[in-house]
């Protein structure tokens, strides 16, 4: 019963962390998709040509579904995997730091567990990702999610819902592996860099909620920035393949086509939007997740 409750706690923490970040940051995701779609439009021109302020939240429902469920599945799967690895050691320790209750692993173990968990969950949520990207773009005039599902199925059948999984996997698996690795390292370094007045302890020697939230969110933001920059080209390739599947048929062709026709810097188009969104999303989601885990410890 304890294991079930613990897993449920991670599911709930991941769900609400992902849901909050998805709704709050949807405009950044939409702008990133449209910047990658168009070769010359600026952020300002896209905003100016939008059909009102609410247009910036177009695609929020599929985004919220994908992010909340994906985050819940990912974080609970990641925890199960990391806990199993940690328990297999003779010197098992279920608390990584004063700011966290997550297991402490080696650099290599954090990298591998993060990548494997993300790859598996990414495949399960791929259909929602495809619907979200097309719903956000201006290439498709979908008026409802059901219309998007029907159109994709009629024109591309089941494979259409998994369009772009290759570059998505190549982007998300390394991203998550690198992120988890950096995040765990950052939680050790950030407290040493913060002014002493921000570091406060409770009677048990753990950080107060305000301190742990600051440490965890700051660590998440810094880690997300670096991991996002490294994997940015695959995000552009993924988006092109999902928006124009008949033109961009595979990862290698898409990569060569973008470099030949638009230049290597185009592979990093939308990076500012993705960087901002991923950093803020990580800060919000992991900050909420870590604290909910502590509140619901059994």
UniProtKB/Swiss-Prot annotation:
Described purpose of this protein according to its UniProt entry: Mitochondrial glycine transporter that imports glycine into the mitochondrial matrix. Plays an important role in providing glycine for the first enzymatic step in heme biosynthesis, the condensation of glycine with succinyl-CoA to produce 5-aminolevulinate (ALA) in the mitochondrial matrix.
Protein name, per record: Mitochondrial glycine transporter
PANTHER family (UniProt xref): MITOCHONDRIAL GLYCINE TRANSPORTER
Cellular compartments annotated: Mitochondrion inner membrane
Superkingdom of origin organism: Eukaryota
GO cellular component: mitochondrial inner membrane
One of the record's GO molecular function terms: glycine transmembrane transporter activity
Keyword Transmembrane helix: yes
């Amino acid at each position: 019963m304890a294991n079930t409750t613990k897993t449920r706690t991670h599911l709930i923490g991941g769900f609400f962390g992902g849901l909050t970040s998805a709704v709050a940051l949807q405009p950044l995701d939409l702008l990133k998709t449209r910047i990658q779609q168009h070769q010359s439009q600026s952020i300002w021109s896209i905003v100016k040509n939008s059909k009102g302020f609410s247009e910036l939240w177009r695609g929020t429902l599929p985004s919220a579904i994908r992010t909340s469920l994906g985050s819940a599945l990912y974080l609970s799967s990641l925890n199960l995997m990391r806990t199993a690895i940690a328990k297999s050691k003779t010197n098992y320790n279920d608390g990584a730091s004063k700011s966290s209750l997550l297991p402490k692993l080696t650099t290599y173990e954090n990298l591998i567990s993060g990548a494997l968990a993300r790859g598996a969950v990414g495949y399960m949520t791929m259909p929602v990702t495809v619907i979200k990207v097309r719903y956000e773009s201006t290439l498709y005039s979908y008026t409802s999610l059901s219309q998007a599902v029907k159109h994709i199925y009629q024109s591309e059948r089941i494979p259409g819902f998994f369009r772009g999984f290759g570059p998505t996997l190549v982007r998300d698996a390394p991203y998550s592996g690198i992120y988890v690795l950096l995040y765990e390292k950052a939680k050790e370094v950030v407290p040493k860099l913060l002014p002493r007045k921000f570091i406060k302890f409770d009677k048990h020697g753990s950080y107060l909620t305000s301190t742990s939230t600051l440490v965890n969110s700051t660590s998440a933001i810094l880690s997300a920035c670096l991991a996002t920059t490294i994997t940015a080209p695959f995000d552009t390739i993924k988006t092109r393949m999902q928006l124009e599947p008949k033109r961009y048929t595979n990862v290698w062709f898409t990569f060569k086509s973008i470099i030949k026709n638009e230049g290597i810097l185009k592979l990093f188009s939308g990076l500012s939007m993705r960087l901002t969104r991923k950093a803020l999303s990580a800060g919000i989601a992991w900050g909420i997740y870590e604290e909910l885990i502590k509140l619901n410890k059994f």
